[in-house]
Amino acid sequence: VGCGGLRAIDDRHGEIKRMYVAPAARGTGVSTAILRRLEAEARALGWERLVLETGEQQPDAMRFYEREGFSRIPLYGHYVDSAISRCYGKSL
C-alpha cells in the first residue's frame, strides 16, 4: 500500500527517501502513518532534522508535506541543479 525510508546525512540529520503511497490508498491516512513512523524512527536515531525531495509536478505531495510541518528549503545534494525538484525540511 505504501512505503518510505530514511537515509542518514550525518549524526543529526536525515533524509526521507522513496516515500510512496498507491493511488487507491491516498487520502486514507496511510501517508500520515508512514510519515509519523519515519519521524519517530529519526528521533530514535537522535536526528534533529529531516529533509526530502519531491517533484514540482507532484502538487499533492507538496501540499501533504507542507501540511505536516515541512518548509521549502534550497535544493541540496543531487538536486542542486534540478529544474524539476522541490526540497523540504523539518526540525524534529
Describe the function of each predicted region.
Residues E48-V51, G55-G69, P74-L92:
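C-terminal "cap" of GNAT-fold acetyltransferases
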Residues H13-G14, R18, A22-A33, R43-L45, ...:
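Conserved glycine-rich acetyl-CoA-binding loop
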Residues V1-K17, A22-P23, L35-R37, E41, ...:
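Acetyl-CoA-dependent GNAT
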